């Protein structure tokens, strides 16, 4: 009865929206929830997972910030969710689906932000050039394999959260680091069986809801990163490009407001999620300016050295232990690794570099540093 009421409410959505009754389904079949839609159920599974919980202790941009008000990875995710749901509600899209994709889009991010991602990718490539670390792919791996789901049914063990295809696709297709991209469309020709072959930064999402999250991912961080840089005394408001101020405003709130209104005006009742050329180019210019003034600053370079040393050091010693696994070895390093391997249920033929990559990617900043210090007796 209650589920029927929820599904009836979905009929009020735009014809362009994704409807949960039309989902391409889960990898393993399940009985539907008596109250929630499939997408709402997915959002709850992500929200209550330990992997999501750890995002509050992972870097967005500024590592080991002294201020309590510097943005963390979890805050960024919640900002993306809030902005995306507002847009989705106005466009008549499925808010439950948007909510789930937004909550899960960074759940597999490495510690130390994008620096950690680059270093971890470099480490694994030195061992196995065929492997790589990209946070959007790893986020899919987290929800498909590494997340622990509490269930009395053995069939769901080692199968992650068993999310719907639309949510999984939105997660793996969310990467919005193509700065020239401000027009997105839903690719309904995608083959669900090829989700693990999604091309980095090239494939469009399957739903308009995922397109919203992908574009908002950029909208949510550029202005907030400027705020954090000002709080860290890295830049001043006067350093913001005057042309950007005229087009988008001076504060994070003004920038978000300008971009959200523009996106809604240009996307309403269309098969696209897009910004006007003027706002899209202003967003691109702001990202490029942030790259120069913030992300490549000497302050962040110092952060990067710490992150690089920690991840490279962890990978080196953990890989050697994973490659020569000895359950009789009682060292702290070996026992930590064995505990992780047993917890995740890896098969005996699992590549040691994959195990170590999974292990490090799941660490918070503080845990990675503490483990590094413990292993090297610092």
Protein language model regions, located:
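Histidine-centered, transition-metal-coordinating active-site segments
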Residues: 1-77, 81-87, 116, 132, ...
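Short pre-active-site segment immediately N-terminal to the catalytic Zn-binding motif
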Residues: 85-97
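Short hydrophobic "helix-edge" motifs at membrane interfaces and signal-peptide entry regions
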Residues: 94-99, 206-208
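Short alpha-helical catalytic segment bearing the HExxH-like zincin motif
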Residues: 98-103, 214
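Acidic, glycine-rich active-site loops and adjacent beta-strand->loop/helix elements
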Residues: 103-107, 124, 146
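Short active-site segment of divalent metal-dependent hydrolases/proteases
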Residues: 104-112, 220
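A glycine- and small-aliphatic-rich helix-loop capping segment at beta-alpha/alpha-beta transitions
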Residues: 113-126
């Amino acid at each position: 009865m209650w589920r029927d009421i929820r599904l009836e409410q979905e009929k009020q959505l735009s014809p362009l929206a994704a409807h949960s009754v039309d989902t391409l389904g889960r990898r393993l079949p399940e009985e539907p929830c008596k109250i929630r839609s499939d997408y709402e159920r997915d959002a709850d599974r992500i929200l209550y997972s330990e992997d999501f919980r750890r995002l509050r202790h992972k870097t967005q941009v500024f590592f080991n910030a002294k201020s309590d008000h510097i943005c963390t990875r979890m805050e960024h995710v919640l900002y993306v969710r809030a902005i995306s749901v507002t847009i989705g509600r106005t466009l008549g899209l499925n808010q439950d689906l948007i909510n789930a994709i937004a909550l899960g889009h960074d759940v597999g991010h490495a510690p130390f932000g994008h620096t950690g991602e680059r270093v971890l990718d470099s480490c694994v490539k030195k061992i196995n050039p065929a492997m790589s670390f990209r946070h959007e792919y790893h986020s899919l791996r987290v929800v498909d394999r590494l997340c622990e789901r509490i269930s009395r049914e053995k069939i769901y063990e080692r199968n992650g959260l068993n999310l719907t295809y639309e949510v999984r696709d939105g997660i793996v297709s969310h990467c919005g680091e193509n700065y020239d991209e401000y027009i997105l469309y839903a690719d309904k020709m995608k083959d669900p069986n090829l989700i693990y072959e999604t091309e980095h930064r090239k494939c469009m999402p399957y739903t308009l809801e995922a397109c919203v999250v992908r574009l908002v991912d950029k909208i949510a961080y550029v202005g907030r990163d400027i705020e954090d840089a000002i709080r860290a005394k890295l830049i001043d408001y006067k350093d913001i490009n005057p042309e950007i101020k005229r087009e988008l405003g001076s504060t994070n709130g003004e920038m978000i407001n300008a971009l959200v209104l523009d996106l809604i005006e240009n996307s309403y009742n269309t098969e696209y999620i897009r910004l006007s050329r003027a706002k899209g180019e202003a967003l691109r210019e702001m990202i490029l300016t942030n790259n120069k003034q913030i992300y490549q600053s000497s302050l962040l370079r110092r952060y990067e050295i710490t992150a690089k040393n920690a991840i490279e050091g962890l990978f080196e010693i953990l890989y050697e232990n994973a490659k020569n696994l000895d359950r009789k070895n009682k060292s702290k390093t070996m026992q930590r690794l064995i505990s992780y391997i047993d917890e995740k249920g890896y098969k005996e033929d699992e590549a040691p570099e994959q195990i170590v990559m999974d292990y490090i990617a799941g660490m918070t900043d503080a845990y990675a540093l503490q483990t590094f210090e413990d292993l090297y007796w610092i």
